[in-house]
Amino acid sequence: MYLDEYKRWLSANLIDFDLHAELASIENDDEAIKERFAVALKFGTAGLRGTLGAGTNRMNIWVVRQATQGVADWIKTQGGTQTVAISYDSRLKGWTFAKDAAAVLAANGIHVRLYDELMPVPALSFATRYYHCNAGIMITASHNPAKYNGFKAYGPDGCQMTDDAAAIVYDQIQKTDVLTGAKYITFAEGVEKGLIQFVGDDCKEALYQAIESRQVRPNLCKTAGLKLVYSPLNGTGLVPVTRVLSDMGITDITIVPEQEYPNGYFTTCPYPNPEIYEALEKGLELAKKVGADLMLATDPDADRVGIAMKCPDGSYELVSGNEMGVLLLDYICAGRIEKGTMPKNPVAVKSIVSTPLADLVAKHYGVELRHTLTGFKWIGDQIAQLEAHGEEERFIFGFEESYGYLAGSYVRDKDAIVGSMLICEMAAYYRSIGSSIKQRLEEIYAQYGRFLNKVDSYEFDGLSGMDKMAGIMNTLRTNPPVEFAGRKVVSLTDYNKPEETGLPKANVLIFGLEDGATVVVRPSGTEPKIKTYFTTLGKDLAEAQKEKDELAAVLKPLFS
């Protein structure tokens, strides 16, 4: 079957020369052909993501057209404006995929609002809402290596597509022949017919105004003298992040030169993920050189932001997503109470794998902290529930441990622009009172306890990898450990059982240990990985780290 499909592609006019060359190069390599054609990339609530290349199991113009036709078929049943917003980041073939998606939608009589320059995830979510679209499409693979690209789908609220909508789109994709099934007109024809229009400056300005309105202490940064190093990691963050920081009064910004402009090859950091040290390395070198107070880095689609803070001894320390989530929650709560801008019955939201330290901080400030499944769409869903009752202003902050933050209801996905703005404002505030982010973090630990949150990942590549991941999760369910490193398991929460959790079904297991530590195990939703999340609590960092290391050592053989 897969050989027949390979031969069909090989004999077709694939338009993209790269695809022809790749197929010709694997003509006698059965394993390579099987990898590309035995299965197809599956469309889910996060859309598609895969390696660039030829075949049904790769990202290419034909798979993008097929997916877009599936989205178009769904939209045509929805009424409304019959409009889709599209954006793209700096990844290879991003503009090509965005134009092809627009052309397929136009061929279906659907209007398109396309950004005329690469713009990040929050800009796509905002445009979807601004133009009252039926859907949004973001061409991105987030922080994956350069060989990846993806097709992220959004619903009319600017949140990732719901399970029901994604299932309908997937069904339509399966009915659409990948090479011949999608309707198509040229991009130029779509523009001439008035079906394809660019996103207007009014929308872009409205986004910046919405973000800047989320400042806790407006005008503070104009006099704080904050010195910043910033890296967009060759992605979309440069223009929007520097625009907002400049508007709020931060002018001493040094951009990492090798990572300033869009470059889908990511030559200076092969894995452009602000969660990891390697992605921040160039920025840290520059921060030390210029004596910056803070170093920021946003991932290619600018929905995540990582930082390194300057410590009193002049060294720099990376701040984890959990730590920054707690710091921002603490800063927003304290600041809004001080300024009299805290709404009545305020609500914050975090994912179930994020630090329980946030619960203690929220309780201290009288804030309701809601827990959601992993994936920012669930935080967006909580905002939508508030909005349905006209109470979206109750939402003050949401975060995930994977460096995603949102303050405000103007978009429904994580936003590294507002995250960068608030982190800089927070740093400027602590600087203005003779303190620092580092000092405030230590004060939080002194007040609530020394929590340590760490994530380990185990990769399972290829077709066999998915089977192995499924087998590991099944073993943990059917024969769960009764202890980890001598610590008894006192609770096991299986999120595959919504009747027990009160949340939608999810492939997540949480083991609670007798000393209060937790171990969370879940497959990644976007990559061939199983992730393990450890939360330990000690009298100091060394004690908490020792327990984490012991727990990780026991778990490691399960994933080998």
Predicted regions and their residues:
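Gly/Ser/Thr-enriched, mixed-charge loops and adjacent short helices
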Residues: 32-41, 149-279, 285-287
